[in-house]
Amino acid sequence: MSSTTIPAAGTNLSILVGILSRDPDLRCLPSGDEVLSLEVTVRPDNGPAESVPVAWLGAPAAAAGWTAGEELLVVGRVRRRFFRAAGATQSRTEVVATCVVPTRRAAAAGKALRSALGTLPAQL
């Protein structure tokens, strides 16, 4: 049996391929930054569908025009953020996207996937 050593810095990489389950929502943050919120539904071969919230800072304007039903490749990292709402501390786990590409753009999707996999430590 072999063992794998994970680097101390760790790796936080999320790759999703799924369907945009609702139209994107573009919001302006108090900082002035814009965030595009996406809801991506992933349907594993043997299992129930899972809905994954995605936040994309600095998304290109064209992405706000995507519509529900579009198949997307999402590359990013998992983040759990905490906030106060209605006087209570709440949390939300989401994928913070670094790249989102419609899968119909096969060359761009392949490039994004290869780039993401290239960030993994060599010893994995």
Regions from the PLM with identified roles:
Residues M1-L124:
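Single-stranded nucleic acid-binding surfaces, predominantly the OB-fold ssDNA-binding core
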